[in-house]
Every structure is written in C-alpha cells, then in structure tokens.
Amino acid sequence: MSVEEGMEVELKSEKMDLDDNIPDFVKETVERSGKNPMSLFSELYVHMTGNTPVFDFYNRNQPNGSMKFICVVILNGERIEGNVKSKKKEAKVSCSLKGLEVVLKHVSEYVVPAVKFEEKTTFFEMLREHTYAKFYELCKNNALIYGFEKVIASVFLKINGNLQIIALSTGNKGLRGDKIVNDGTALIDCHAEILARRGLLRFLYSEVLKFSTEPPNSIFTKGKNALVLKPGISFHLFINTAPCGVARIDKKLKPGTSDDLQNSSRLRFKIDKGMGTVLGGASEFEAPQTFDGIMMGERMRTMSCSDKLLRANVLGVQGAILSHFIDPIYYSSIAVAELNNADRLRKAVYSRAATFKPPAPFHVQDVEIGECQVEDTEQSTSAAARSTISSMNWNLADGNTEVVRTSDGMVHDKDMSGADITTPSRLCKKNMAELMITICTLTKTSVDYPISYEELKAGSQEYAAAKKSFITWLRQKDLGIWQRKPREFQMFTIN
C-alpha cells in the first residue's frame, strides 16, 4: 500500500468514527478539506478570533470505576462541549466537530479577516492581499473551500491602472494514473498556478465571445491577423509559494558544483502519487508515455509548474486553441510570496529561454518578477507545500466556485436524493474545446466536423510550429526532454 493510499484509508476510518449527531455539512466539510477535525477547527478558530483554541478536559467517573472524558473549548464567549468519550483524543475530536458546527453556521459573519490595504503597500503586496481577501469572500458563500488555501494562485487584469482579480485557484496535487480517461473530462494538473491560468482562459473565451457581439465592451480589438489586447491592458500572476521545479529546487543545490551548473536550469516533471519533481533529461524518459502503460501502473509524468510558466512566457498563456482567434498574451509580472528568490524565479520563467528566438508573433517575455515578502522561511514551506485532496477554482466569467477532487480531476456532488454524482470540471479540455466551437458558430467560422481535440489544436499552425521549435531548442541546449501526455488524451471528438 502506498503512503497516499494509507493516508486515504486513515482518513476514511476517522470519518467512520464521527459522531452520528454531527450534521452532514460538517462531515462533508471535514472530508473535502482532507484534514482531521481538530486541525480544521483550529484553523477556522484562528481565522475567527486571531487566537489558538484552548481545549480543557474534564473527567467523568463511571459506575464500573473506569474514567471517561469531556473536552470543552470557548469560542467568542460560547462554551462548546463535546460528547463523553473513553479517550482524550476522541473527546477532543468530538469537541472539534461541535465547534465546526458553530463556526460553519456563523461563517458568513466571522469568516472574512480584516485585510488592511495601506497606502504604502507595493503593487505585488496588493496582489497578495486582494487574493486572500477574495478567497475569504468566496468562503462566505461556500464554507467547504475553507482550508484549501495552503497553495493559492490568482490572475489579475490591469486596465489603465485599475486592478481586478479575474481568476483564483488552490491546490498542489494532480490526477492519479489509475484514474485517467481519454475523453478530455478529467483535469490532469491541479496545481494552483496551472488552474489559475485555465480560469484565465475561461475569461479570455468570454471576452472573445463579447467581441463578436459587443466589441466596445471587450478587452480585444482587431489586429493585423487576429484579435489583440487593447492598449493599457496587462495580466499579472500571483502565487503564494514558489512553483515546483527550477524555481524551488535550485535553492537546494550547492553553488559552484557541476550539479549547480548542469541541473539548476534543466526541465523537471511531477510524477503521479509523488511529491516534488524529477529531472527530465534521463534516457529512460525519452520514450513517449502511453495510455495503456499508465493504466498498467507506469507513473504518469507531468511537466513542473516552473517549466509550464517558462512555456507561457514563450508561447503565451492562451494556448493552442485560442490562438485561432487571438495573438499571444503574456503575463506582465509574476509575484511569489513564500520561498521566493527573485534570481531563482527569473531563471525559472525567463532566463533559461532568453536566447531562444521563436517565430512571429511569439517572443520570449521578459516578465517582471515581484516579491511579496523579504524572508524565505522554511517554516512557511511545510505548511504551504502540504497536499490537499481537493482543489477549488473561481473565475470572473463564471462567477462561482467549483471544487475538484484532485485524484480523479472531477467535480463530486450529490443530487436531491443524496446520491453521489460526478461531472467534468469547467476547466477540463472538453469543456474548453466546446467553448471554442461556440465561438466558431457565433463568428461563422468554418469547422470540418467531426473534429478531434488534437486536430483542433493542430489547426493553429503558428502555435504548433513555435511549440515544436521551442521543445527542440530545449533539447539541443541540453535542458531536458519535454514530457508529453499520450495521444489518447487528445483524440476525443468534440461535439
């Protein structure tokens, strides 16, 4: 049994021990958070009061001479008492569950911490503050996303000095290999900065649609060959901790060694059911990944977030499909809070590819690197890097939150009868492609049906050529092998 499977079994076992009289919404909140009731209650308690909860225990002598316990905590002057239990830990769990019931019922009143926007706050600090303020605002309408913010990312739109958050996501895990599907409905990479970009895509799709119906109200205008951003518009990315890969691993390498020179710039990838990243230049990783191989137990490989951000600074954030209609769009700045080092981050997302010359209309974006705090503390890392079993996403176009189970990349909910239902995320390949087809229909753009997702991407020939050139260049510079997913992931038909 793997470590992750063992953790899941332990979590399920703990849920089975929950008190029967605890409301379902409390049990569901604990389950979705991936945390034990004591940890979750303590975090919410701190959010509400600014203090750590103090648990007191009282003995209850039984007629047979045995000892049982009751745990009590005070929340905003209210005494919260758990059920009588034979062990102190069980009593504390019971008290925490009762406390969660109180907290969640009052979440809309207490949940949003006071975020101070001071006049001297820097632009990048504003990104951080607005990100957390937005997240806690969303918690008011969906308490189940509490505790998801260990790794959080957001994208901001800046128009002539006015700043607006347009996408926000949390998460630091990905799809398990035994849960893969070939119909484009499952999210593969649920790391926060990756989902924030996909939320940005939803916004960009909505703006392209808006241009087709009311051009003056869209962020786009007509360019020479495609839509381009209007003057004064830029996009900015915030991440609360350094992206996995080069931006993070470089800190651990010894300066001046061959490892430092050779490995600190090389491509790295995430492996399913694993933590951290692996160098992508080894010969055993040259063979393409296969669908049946992953199904049979091979560990799926996904490029690190540092490498994906590097790609975005070369090919744009819009991806292949939107490139049918718009010119490349780049982040103007990337800001990181914990574990940030401006030199490391700059190397990760820009310097490694600075000498690459992509074909027009692409370029290597000299993105501005922002720092939201001075100290790079290890203590913050342990909290920020903790994996969660769920991820949330929000974007301005859709306007509501969505919770995704990272192990299968799907949205899990219950119908009116209480039965479990599973649906694709709005950020998945299939739903994004269907948005593209909607745009083609409204703009009367010819599409040869039936068409696969792979064919739709390949139709953006300039993007495909630039991507191929970039991947070839990376290998020629001995920076490693770009790991591609099996073709089956992109061969599904779009309706």
UniProtKB/Swiss-Prot annotation:
Catalytic activity entry: adenosine in double-stranded RNA + H2O + H(+) = inosine in double-stranded RNA + NH4(+)
Domain A to I editase intervals: 167-492
Location (main, coarse): nucleus
Top enzyme class: hydrolase
PROSITE patterns assigned: A_DEAMIN_EDITASE, DS_RBD
GO cellular component: cytoplasm; nucleolus; nucleus
Other information: Can prevent somatic transgenes from inducing gene silencing via the RNA interference (RNAi) pathway. This may occur due to A-to-I editing of transgene-derived dsRNA, preventing transgene RNAi.
Protein name: Double-stranded RNA-specific adenosine deaminase adr-2
Organism expressing this protein natively: Caenorhabditis elegans
